[in-house]
Amino acid sequence: MKLYVYLLGFIAYALSVYSCKNENDELFETSLANISDIEVYWVRNTHSESQNIYSLAFTGANIGWFNVTTREIKLKNIKLDPNRFPVNSKLEFRIKDCPLFMASSFVTNINSQVFLDLVLFYDIIEDKYYLDDCYPNTKAIKNTADVQQRISERTTHWEVFINTLKAEKKLRQ
């Protein structure tokens, strides 16, 4: 049964990569883009996916640096206020018109929900942002099959994001 679930997930992932590749061949062949091409949108879900509301949260120009080890993302010239984050919204990371990956939520230290997918975590005590694979970011949750599958599905697009930051010298180890 697990094999079928993984196979189905792989097929869905392959189709999403393939559809982006047709639209932006150069982007995925070189795995590089300009930092100015990165855009991150709040996506407020509606009942119809075609009517979702997109509003710009920040761009690549607002990314000061990203630490691959800690997953901290330093934003400059912008402060994301968790109180103003639209309810039931996600964060979609894009390069040009092609979606890279989606953060399932914007969470803070005071959230009590568990998220088994990528989140933008804001540490209100240290005033820092992180792109974590789950929330809370513990080994017990991170090692679950669901979280590991989502990490695997995001790998190709995550590498494009990392390589773009690396080319712009905005990557820290």
Regions found by a protein language model. Give the residues of each.
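Extracytoplasmic
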Residues: L27-Y122, P136-E153
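Bacterial Sec-dependent N-terminal signal peptides
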Residues: L15-T30
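C-terminal partner/receptor-binding element of secreted or periplasmic proteins
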Residues: Y122-Q173
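Sec-dependent bacterial lipoprotein signal peptides
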Residues: M1-Y18
